[in-house]
Amino acid sequence: MTIRSPEPEVKIAVERDPVKTSFEKWAQPGHFSRTLAKGPSTTTWIWNLHADAHDFDSHTNDLEEISRKVFSAHFGQLAIIFIWLSGMYFHGARFSNHEAWLSDPTHVKPSAQVVWPIVGQEILNGDVGGGFQGIQITSGFFQIWRASGITSELQLYSTAIGGLIFAALMLFAGWFHYHKAAPKLTWFQDVESMLNHHLAGLLGLGSLSWAGHQVHVSLPINQLLDAGVDAKEIPLPHEFILNRDLMTQLYPSFAKGLTPFFTLNWSEYSDFSTFRGGLNPVTGGLWLTDTVHHHLAIAVLFLIAGHMYRTNWGIGHSLKEILEAHKGPFTGEGHKGLYEIFTTSWHAQLALNLAMLGSLTIVVAHHMYSMPPYPYLATDYGTQLSLFTHHMWIGGFLVVGAAAHAAIFMVRDYDPTTQYNNLLDRVLRHRDAIVSHLNWACIFLGFHSFGLYIHNDTMSALGRPQDMFSDTAIQLQPIFAQWVQNTHAVAPFSTAPNAAASTSLTWGGIDLVAVGGKVALLPIPLGTADFLVHHIHAFTIHVTVLILLKGVLFARSSRLIPDKANLGFRFPCDGPGRGGTCQVSAWDHVFLGLFWMYNAISVVIFHFSWKMQSDVWGSVSDQKIVTHITGGNFAQSSITINGWLRDFLWAQASQVIQSHGSSLSAYGLPFLGAHFVWAFSLMFLFSGRGYWQELIESIVWAHNKLKVAPAIQPRALSIVQGRAVGVAHYLLGGIATTWAFFLARIIAVG
């Protein structure tokens, strides 16, 4: 990879008109590659085109040009996101029962999709309440709109148009910053400036402006909605912003203006910026005054953080200095050399960001149900289940992506001559110890966690319930988890004396929040059943990590193939004549890691779905008696494999299997179709390239006989392509099957 010489003293961060705008190039598929630009001679061409179109490393060696392409592509990505968001808001304005839901969120179900009456498809439009027929949606948009103070279709239309304007701006920026004013490499490598702007601008000012919107628009509108005022009677957002008297009626401290702020009497503002904890009993969501406080605090933190790094003024932190000073007594050169890695390898940078973002997304999944941030989210069980499942899947994919790009970095960008005795080098040198120990941990966890279930199934089959691991026989209580729960539950009276309630009702206590006769949230008990399944979680996560980490650590070389780096990121085998060297490429480890990621996430979402239906979700009578959806059967049924199959998969699949002829057949058909897609994947995964090439050649012979031979020669998929198609359909089929199963079930019973 060529890295250009340093620029002269005067900083000119952009280059003018570096690449001319050419419609001819756009019209020529594969213009970025001499081989692909020639056009197809065999069917392999279309696969290579898709594989390489966005692999900018394969277009050029120039790091500056690669950086510009990535930068420009990001604007394209943002444009797509804005168009998607705009579409969501437009549907909410044009095809939804949003205003009916807003007036009665406990009885009306959200819908923003109406099926046209073609071949009888209108059966899919169920009665969602409020005199509306449509498909029930579980995306949570209605709840977000309620929280942000949107009360009318006009506001949704306006936001949708705004989204399209932003999308156009992004598309323009993507073109402008590649063709007209392209940043120089030094600009992409100026990490201190980037940190300052992203921390202070995106996160700091972003949070501050959201906090401002919440205070001046969301809070007053939500307070009036909570009090039962009709949405059409509520003043418009600009009236709250411009008319202080209007705000003073709801929040008296507004009469004092900014005086308390400058005199440091901040407690005066506690009518709209609170620290209450717990949930609003009217909506079942977090107190919006708490979330205002949260965003204000985040803004302060990040505005400070965005002024910590040294740029033109010679004060503040230098990242290179921080990294190079970061060494302990046993860690050799420590982080020396990492600065150069992260400023010259975007794969390394991306790997780090994906690992962080993936972990964060999974953290979000767990907070969405335990601290539901939007009004009426907690009692919309379909949305709760969808949001948890969605964020778990996304997090899983991002973490696997982190390993993929870490391995690409190792193969393409890692220079062993510059990395001596730093942490990366030391990790690579003792990789055998890491991988073999991790392998031992996986075997231990696998045998012991699964063994507990096998024991229970055997005892159950032999009619010996007294010898099973369960809450009523041999107890295996998760005492550490229970201790953590209890510590948080008692915090308001001990370690957090100013809080009115603990951070989440799930920790414990006696509180129960019910909205409209449905449980929003209550303390979640943990027992032997949770102890067992948590060890399955530990097992599947560790195996996923083992596969992915082995792929990264052995991406460049191994005892089996010392020169692996020369073979690239993805290759089928180490050439003919070397048996037993297939499926060792870094790409193959990502491929295998995806299957275990799928295993891991499946167990998590199954656990969540059943646990919530059994122990949390349900109806509440006037006498405060809770009736859970599956009547608390998780603790006794989920302790055997048979119980998972019988009382979860089979029992809860009845809704999707029996959905035909009703509006839920919107899930019944995809349930069948997704099973087919999943089964179809096995055809790619369980057969070799040679089989297909032989078959293709006899089919081509038949075409030749009939004088209808194609000009482009058919070729079987390469080994790697076949596995890619296989895993894509496996995951798509598996995820879509789970989606149909979950939603048909929860919409029917929730």
Curated annotation (Swiss-Prot):
Subcellular location(s) of the protein: Plastid, Chloroplast thylakoid membrane
GO BP terms, alphabetized: photosynthesis
CC cofactor note: P700 is a chlorophyll a/chlorophyll a' dimer, A0 is one or more chlorophyll a, A1 is one or both phylloquinones and FX is a shared 4Fe-4S iron-sulfur center.
GO cellular component: chloroplast thylakoid membrane; photosystem I
SUPFAM superfamilies noted in UniProt: Photosystem I subunits PsaA/PsaB
Keyword Membrane belongs to the record: yes
Keywords associated with the record: 4Fe-4S, Chlorophyll, Chloroplast, Chromophore, Electron transport, Iron, Iron-sulfur, Magnesium, Membrane, Metal-binding, Oxidoreductase, Photosynthesis, Photosystem I, Plastid, Thylakoid, Transmembrane, Transmembrane helix, Transport
Transmembrane segments: 70-93, 156-179, 195-219, 291-309, 346-369, 385-411, 433-455, 531-549, 589-610, 664-686, 724-744
Topology term for the membrane: Multi-pass membrane protein
UniProt-annotated binding residues for chlorophyll a': H675
Thylakoid keyword on record: yes
Entry binding sites for chlorophyll a: M683, Y691
Subunit composition and interactions: The PsaA/B heterodimer binds the P700 chlorophyll special pair and subsequent electron acceptors. PSI consists of a core antenna complex that captures photons, and an electron transfer chain that converts photonic excitation into a charge separation. The eukaryotic PSI reaction center is composed of at least 11 subunits.
Function of the protein: PsaA and PsaB bind P700, the primary electron donor of photosystem I (PSI), as well as the electron acceptors A0, A1 and FX. PSI is a plastocyanin-ferredoxin oxidoreductase, converting photonic excitation into a charge separation, which transfers an electron from the donor P700 chlorophyll pair to the spectroscopically characterized acceptors A0, A1, FX, FA and FB in turn. Oxidized P700 is reduced on the lumenal side of the thylakoid membrane by plastocyanin.
Record-given protein name: Photosystem I P700 chlorophyll a apoprotein A1
Source organism (scientific name): Huperzia lucidula (Shining clubmoss)
